[in-house]
C-alpha cells in the first residue's frame, strides 16, 4: 500500500493492524520524521518527496491512497506514475472528508451536484492502461 501525502503517517499507522505493508510519502521532511517517530516497529517505510516525483518499481503496490491531499498534486504528472507503479487491477483511493453542507456553502453545492449525477453514491472507476 502506498499512502501519498502521508503527513505524520496517520493512515498507515491506523491500518497497520490489518496486515498490509505500507509505504508513505510526503513533501515535508519534518512530517516524515514525525511519522517515523510515531511508528516504531511497524515496518512502515516513509520517504520525503513530492508525490509527482515518486519512483518506485513497476507494479510495486496493490493500492495507493491519497487522504485529504489530492488537490495539491499535479495530476498530469502523478497519474501516469501511479498507473505504472500499481499492480494489474490496482486501485487508487482518494479520500476527501469535506464539510457538511450546512457548514459550508460550496461543500453543500458540491454535494448537490454529486447527488444529482450519482443519487446512490456509486463511484465510477477508471482503469489505468499500459
Regions found by a protein language model. Give the residues of each.
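Class I SAM-dependent methyltransferase SAM/SAH-binding core
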Residues: 2-4, 8-53
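Conserved catalytic/acceptor-binding region of the Class I
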Residues: 83-130
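A short, conserved alpha-helix within the catalytic core of class I
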Residues: 73-82
Amino acid at each position: 500500500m502506498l499512502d501519498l501525502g502521508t503527513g505524520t503517517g496517520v493512515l498507515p499507522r491506523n491500518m497497520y493492524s490489518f496486515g498490509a505493508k505500507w509505504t508513505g510519502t510526503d513533501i515535508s521532511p519534518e512530517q516524515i520524521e514525525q511519522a517515523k517517530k510515531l511508528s516504531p516497529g511497524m515496518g512502515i517505510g516513509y520517504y520525503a518527496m513530492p508525490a509527482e516525483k515518486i519512483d518506485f518499481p513497476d507494479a510495486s503496490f496493490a493500492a495507493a491512497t491519497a487522504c485529504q491531499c489530492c488537490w495539491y498534486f499535479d495530476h498530469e504528472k502523478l497519474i501516469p506514475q501511479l498507473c505504472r507503479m500499481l499492480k494489474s487491477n490496482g486501485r487508487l483511493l482518494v479520500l476527501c472528508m469535506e464539510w457538511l453542507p450546512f457548514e459550508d456553502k460550496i461543500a453543500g453545492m458540491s454535494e448537490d451536484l454529486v447527488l444529482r449525477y450519482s443519487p446512490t453514491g456509486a463511484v465510477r472507476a477508471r482503469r489505468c492502461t499500459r
